C-alpha cells in the first residue's frame, strides 16, 4: 500500500504541516486507492477533479503562511444522502439518480471551513432503508473484509471506504443503526451522536425524529475531531440543541478507565444472539473490568418492544417525508402521463425500489384512519417508556454496553427475500435512536471465520466524549 495512505489523521496532519507530503499527493493516492478497490462499489461518484483542485489550493494556502484548518487535507467520503453543492444527491435511488444538489448541508459547510477534502459520495441503501447496502439503485457494496459478505447498512459505502483505506474518515447517517451496524461489520468505529447534536439541514430525511449524521473512522481520536467540527446549534435546523460543544479530543486524551461504571443489560444477551458474538463481547467486557471499569447488571425491560416500535414510527415518518418525490418538481418522471394522478403513481412506482415501497406502504397503513391509535399513537407511548428505561439505568451507570449486531456479516443476497430477518439485524441499535441518545460501535474481535464483531456503548444524552473515550480504551486492550 502507498506510504501516502494513513491510519489516523494525526499522522497525516504532522506530515502535511511539516511539508513532508503535500495535500495534492495524498489526495491523489486516495483517489488511486478508490480506483484499485472499485469492485467493492463503495462509491456512487468520485470527485477526482474537484478533490485534486481543492488539495492543490490547500497546498497553496499553507505555502502562503495561512493557518490550516482543524481538518486540513483530511480525505473524506460522504454518504450520498448528505447534500454537497453541485454534486449528485441520489440517496441510492433511481428517483434521484440525476438530481444535483443546489446547496451544501450544514455539516458539509463546517467540514469545508476546516479544510477537509471530499473524495466522493458513498453508496448506501436506497433512502437509507436497509441493513446491507444491497437496496441501492447503483448496485450492492461488498465488504472489504470478505467480498462475499454484506458490509451492513445503510451506510455501507461509507464503512467500506474507511475500512478499505479509500478514505480516512467518512460521514454517514444513522436512523436505526445505519452507522453502527456497518461499522461493526467492517471492523471500524461508527459513532451516532445524540439527536440534535449535529444539524440535519441538508440530510435527506428518512425518519426526521430519528436521523442523525454520524462519523465512521479507524480511530476514536479522528471521530472525536470530526464531531467537534460538525456538532452545534444551527438556525437552519430547529431540532439542534444549544448544548455547548465539548472539547471531545481533549476528553478522549485525558480519559481514565478506572472507576467507569458499565451497565450490562440481560436483555442484550438472549438466545437470539450468536454465541460467538456473545463470547467475543463478554471477553472484551472482562478486559475492560481488568482495566479498572466496573460491570453492573441493569435492566431495560421494554427493549423487547423496540424493534416493532421503531418500524412503526420510522416507516410512518418515511411515508410522510418521501411524499415529496412525485415526479412533478424534481427527480425521475415516468413517461406514463395520460393524467396527473397516473404520472404521480407511475413515477413513484418506477422510481422507488422494493424496500422503499414496502416501508412507505407500512407507514401509510399505520397512519391511516382506524389504525393510527392502534399502532402509531401506541408506539409513541412505548418510545417514551424505552427512553425512561435508559434514563433510569443511567442513574447508576455511566454507559451501557452490549453487542452491536446479533449476527456476523451475512452473505450477499442471503436475506433480501426475508425482510423480517433483515430487520432483526437492527435489534440492538434502534433503542438509541428511539431514545435520542449517543452510541458507538467499536471493533471487539472476530468469529472463527475471521468475520468482524462490534461492541456497542450507549451513552447519556450528550455523553459523546465518554463513549469516544471508551472506544479509544477498547482499542488499546
UniProtKB/Swiss-Prot annotation:
Listed GO CC annotations: glutamyl-tRNA(Gln) amidotransferase complex
Coiled-coil stretches noted in the UniProt entry, renumbered to this chain: none
Keywords: ATP-binding, Ligase, Nucleotide-binding, Protein biosynthesis
InterPro entries linked to this entry: Amidase (IPR000120), Amidase_CS (IPR020556), Amidase_dom (IPR023631), AS_sf (IPR036928), GatA (IPR004412)
Catalysed reactions, semicolon-separated: L-glutamyl-tRNA(Gln) + L-glutamine + ATP + H2O = L-glutaminyl-tRNA(Gln) + L-glutamate + ADP + phosphate + H(+)
GO biological process, one term: translation
Active-site residue list: 79, 154, 178
Presence of the UniProt keyword Nucleotide-binding in the record: yes
Top-level taxon of origin: Bacteria
MF terms in GO: ATP binding; glutaminyl-tRNA synthase (glutamine-hydrolyzing) activity
Record's keyword annotation contains Oxidoreductase: no
EC number: 6.3.5.7
EC supergroup of this enzyme: ligase
UniProt family annotation: Belongs to the amidase family. GatA subfamily.
Quaternary data: Heterotrimer of A, B and C subunits.
Functional note: Allows the formation of correctly charged Gln-tRNA(Gln) through the transamidation of misacylated Glu-tRNA(Gln) in organisms which lack glutaminyl-tRNA synthetase. The reaction takes place in the presence of glutamine and ATP through an activated gamma-phospho-Glu-tRNA(Gln).
Protein name per the record: Glutamyl-tRNA(Gln) amidotransferase subunit A
Record lineage: Bacteria, Pseudomonadati, Chlorobiota, Chlorobiia, Chlorobiales
